[in-house]
Amino acid sequence: VYKRQLADYRGKVIFLNFWATWCGPCREELSRVQKDIIDRFKGNEDFVFLPVSRGETRETVAAFREKMGYTFPMGLDPEQKIYRLYASNYIPRNFLIGKDGKVISATIGYEAPEFDELILLIERQLNSAN
């Protein structure tokens, strides 16, 4: 469970991702996250990736993370309280939030070209002077 709020990350580019272990498109998307997001932006203190598992237990998420070999932390939202602040249906659900705290992009589902565009948006935000 994340113990911080989005406001704690003001001034940073935030990639907020809602997912679940049973969701095929979520799993496909997460398979790209390590290489295309975590490794690519590693060490950039202006970037934060917040993956939030929707409706699952700590044990389920921990077992999935270990099985897949992911090194990034995964937040928990077992009762979907956080998710309901952003959406009512469908995962994966992604929000790219700019340094000013405003949503730049919101996507539903996983499609490779859309994910590629998200990576470019992250790069542009990190390279901007704001």
Residue ranges, per PLM feature:
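Conserved helix-turn-beta segment immediately C-terminal to the redox Cys motif
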Residues: K12-V13, E28-P51, E66
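Thiol-/selenol-based redox modules, centered on thioredoxin-like
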Residues: L96-N130
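Extracytoplasmic/secreted envelope proteins and their assembly/folding machinery
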Residues: L6, L30, Q34, I38, ...
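Short active-site neighborhood of thiol/selenol oxidoreductases, capturing the structured segment around
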Residues: L6-R27
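Active-site loop/turn elements of alpha/beta-hydrolase fold enzymes
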Residues: R54
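Short, small-residue-biased leader/transition segments that mark boundaries at the very start
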Residues: V1-Y2
